[in-house]
């Protein structure tokens, strides 16, 4: 059986050239939800995507997935082409650069001062270090996070 990450890598490689501007491939996820496998292809464009956009992109992507040989999928799956939503993943250095000034959530591979998850305003990102302003109980603090220690980053909703 092929690992889920390998399936994501194969699908990303196949569909990326087919996603044309103004659309951007944000993420590919493959996971079991309930009893079904779901392949989620998250797409965005400036101003957001419409239902018509997702239908059009499904028509582009679906036939491409059928051409992958050998078939990497262990079982039937549901294809979902959708918007990344409000808590969009930030998977690349470019995505983080574009998120400067935004409220984000960052999970780390190893803790900084006994903290592995930071949520706050991304003040800057120079390609190597993220600087985040966050609340520690009742005080604002600033932390510098080396990019290579970031396990996951996403936009977050500030409540």
UniProtKB/Swiss-Prot annotation:
Main location: cytoplasm
Gene3D superfamilies cross-referenced by the UniProt entry: Ribosome maturation factor RimP, C-terminal domain, RimP-like superfamily, N-terminal
GO cellular component: cytosol
Disulfide bonds: none
Alphabetical UniProt keywords: Cytoplasm, Ribosome biogenesis
Family matches, as SUPFAM superfamilies: YhbC-like, C-terminal domain, YhbC-like, N-terminal domain
Function noted in UniProt: Required for maturation of 30S ribosomal subunits.
Protein name per the record: Ribosome maturation factor RimP
Organism: Streptococcus agalactiae serotype V (strain ATCC BAA-611 / 2603 V/R)
Lineage start: Bacteria, Bacillati, Bacillota, Bacilli, Lactobacillales
